[in-house]
């Protein structure tokens, strides 16, 4: 049996979960539930895909305890978890999937590193990357091809900076941070003052950008530095592709921002906030902890209570739901009003006759 082949029983032991079925079943790969074959392990998380359970050829299926009670009679090999099946499946990837390496170990000779920069042990710096003066790259970091680490910036241990990322001067990147290609961290904010002659003069931005530990930043996302105060993304937050975070914004711990969202300057986002795709948030407001914004939400004032919000301007989801229901009934209301108008006209005609 190869290192990448495991029995169902071995996998259950590794994942610390229970199993039902033939413990000797051999598994050597992972696949989504519709495509999985007898040597594959898969998972069911979203009930929309439960329709594929009966026909699935997967050698083993990771499901929750609640799902197991519903589907235990299907005579399948099940791994039963109290956690999210998707999270447990992710652990399987550590066994079956070998990460793709760039093929450039160590520091490539074309990398440009300033003599005052500090590079700790076990760092990989790929071709044509630039590390500027007094920058500090922590141990076991990976700096991708063409990326720039600006002057006086720091990159914490075990962080992975993908190709063509720009980290400007005086930026602080925490430990285990992942930044995808094309992201720009620390550009000057969009701050201007208009002169008496109508000319827009750019203001100097002296603040820093601070990215705390375990943050992930998507491709082509931009996080601007503040004019005086710092722009901050707190521990564990995840930011999707094409997100704009303006100057002096603070994003709380373990929040999630989906693609094409934009946050204007000096706004403070709480902890465990979810911001849907293409949402827009105005500047100088606060968003409470545990707020969820639906896609394309337009936020024009502070949100002080947890809950689900949507629409433009943003309002509680229940209110939107009621409004949508009323709009759906408008055709019937129109018919009733037309009927009432006809009735009134008849009554008026009768009144005139008498």
Curated annotation (Swiss-Prot):
Which GO biological process annotations does it have? lipid A biosynthetic process
Determine if NAD is one of this entry's keywords: no
What molecular function does GO assign, one term? N-acyltransferase activity
Q: Give the UniProt keywords, A-Z.
A: Acyltransferase, Lipid A biosynthesis, Lipid biosynthesis, Lipid metabolism, Repeat, Transferase
Q: Where is the active site?
A: 247
* Enzyme Commission number(s): 2.3.1.191
Catalytic reaction list = a UDP-3-O-[(3R)-3-hydroxyacyl]-alpha-D-glucosamine + a (3R)-hydroxyacyl-[ACP] = a UDP-2-N,3-O-bis[(3R)-3-hydroxyacyl]-alpha-D-glucosamine + holo-[ACP] + H(+)
Its cellular-component GO annotations read: membrane
Q: In which pathway does it act?
A: Bacterial outer membrane biogenesis; LPS lipid A biosynthesis
Indicate the quaternary assembly. Homotrimer.
General function of this protein: Catalyzes the N-acylation of UDP-3-O-acylglucosamine using 3-hydroxyacyl-ACP as the acyl donor. Is involved in the biosynthesis of lipid A, a phosphorylated glycolipid that anchors the lipopolysaccharide to the outer membrane of the cell.
Family classification: Belongs to the transferase hexapeptide repeat family. LpxD subfamily.
This chain belongs to the protein called UDP-3-O-acylglucosamine N-acyltransferase
- Tell me which species this is from: Chlamydia trachomatis serovar L2b (strain UCH-1/proctitis)
């Amino acid at each position: 049996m190869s290192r990448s082949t495991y029995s169902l029983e071995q996998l259950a032991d590794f994942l610390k979960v229970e199993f039902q079925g033939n413990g000797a079943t051999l598994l050597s790969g992972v696949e989504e539930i519709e495509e999985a074959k007898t040597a594959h392990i898969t998972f069911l998380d979203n009930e929309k895909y439960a329709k594929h359970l009966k026909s699935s050829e997967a050698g083993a299926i990771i499901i929750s305890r609640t799902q197991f009670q519903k589907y235990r009679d299907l005579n399948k090999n099940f791994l039963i978890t109290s956690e999210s099946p998707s999270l447990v499946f992710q652990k399987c990837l550590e066994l079956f999937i070998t990460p793709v390496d760039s093929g450039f170990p160590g520091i490539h000779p074309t990398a440009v590193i300033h003599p005052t920069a500090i590079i700790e042990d076990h760092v990989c710096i790929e071709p044509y990357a630039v590390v500027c003066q007094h920058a500090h790259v922590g141990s076991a970091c990976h700096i991708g091809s063409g990326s720039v680490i600006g002057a006086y910036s720091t990159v914490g241990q075990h962080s992975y900076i993908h190709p063509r990322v720009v980290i400007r001067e005086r930026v602080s990147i925490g430990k285990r941070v992942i930044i995808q290609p094309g992201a720009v961290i620390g550009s000057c904010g969009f701050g201007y003052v208009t002169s008496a002659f109508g000319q827009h003069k750019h203001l100097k931005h002296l603040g820093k950008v601070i990215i705390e530990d375990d943050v992930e930043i998507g491709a082509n996302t931009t996080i601007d530095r503040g004019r005086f105060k710092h722009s901050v993304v707190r521990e564990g937050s995840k930011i999707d592709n094409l997100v704009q975070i303006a100057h002096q914004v603070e994003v709380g711990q373990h929040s999630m921002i989906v693609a094409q969202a934009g946050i204007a300057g000096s706004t403070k986002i709480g902890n465990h906030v979810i911001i849907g795709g293409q949402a827009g948030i105005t500047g100088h407001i606060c968003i409470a902890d545990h707020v969820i914004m639906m896609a394309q939400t337009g936020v024009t004032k502070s949100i002080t209570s947890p809950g689900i919000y949507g629409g433009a301007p943003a309002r509680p989801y229940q209110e939107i739901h009621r409004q949508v229901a009323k709009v759906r009934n408008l055709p019937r209301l129109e018919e009733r009003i037309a009927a009432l108008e006809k009735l009134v006209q008849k009554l008026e005609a009768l009144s005139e006759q008498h």
